[in-house]
Amino acid sequence: QRQMCIRDRGLVDKAIGQFRVNANLDLNFRLWKDTVNFYARGYVSNTLPSFYMRHYHSNHYNWDNDNMDKEFRTRVEGELNISRWGTNLRAGVENIKNYTYFNQSALPEQNGGNIQVLSATLKQDFRLGIFHLDNEVTWQKTSNETVLPLPQLSLYHNFYILAKLAKKVLTVQLGADVRYFTKYNAPAYAPGVQQFHLQPTDDLVEIGGYPIVNVYANLHLKRTRIFAMIYHVNAGMGSANSFLVPHYPINPRLFKIGVSWNFYD
């Protein structure tokens, strides 16, 4: 199956010539006794930064950036999916010219050159009887870590037991999951503009390199669902410098419980 979509958004002045072209290709083929799904996607876009990036006025921040150029983006990616194996692999490359971002002063700025971003994500699920292990690994590489910082590696693993009890009326799920990403100089948050921006060079905070572990239990009985979770169960067991965003620490250990009951009309 092949698809192509072209959108022209140009109107007047600098908006003339805006466009976005999408292309998709879907293929299914046999591999031994399994069906493999292959997807190829790509797009080319040439668009002005958002109105918010070009014009903003408030008590603390003001800007009018009428001279901003269009962002030119090109991306190509491929995806391979084998459902029977629980395997999904996706990889892509993107080139961005005139990348628009919020600088160290939380003001919009454009990078006049080209930035390339390579990325690959592998999802692999394993099952042995009632035991399940879901995994997701993402690798990223940016050609300009100063303007577009990214964690090079992000991990998610979820190990759980899934079983049906009481004559298969009660579904029970017990497990633990962990999230982790490598250290990098993540964007800081500016409440005044409600946006993430590059960290000031004199106040860099490197975040990452710290796992967040949760344990949980889910019960499903007819129309009733009950869940319980201990979030960040490993709080206080490792580095005290644990942040999701610079200067915003991760929430401490937290217990959550909830009930969902569906009523019929």
Residue ranges and their predicted role:
Residues 1-265:
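Exposed, low-structure sequence patches enriched in small/polar residues
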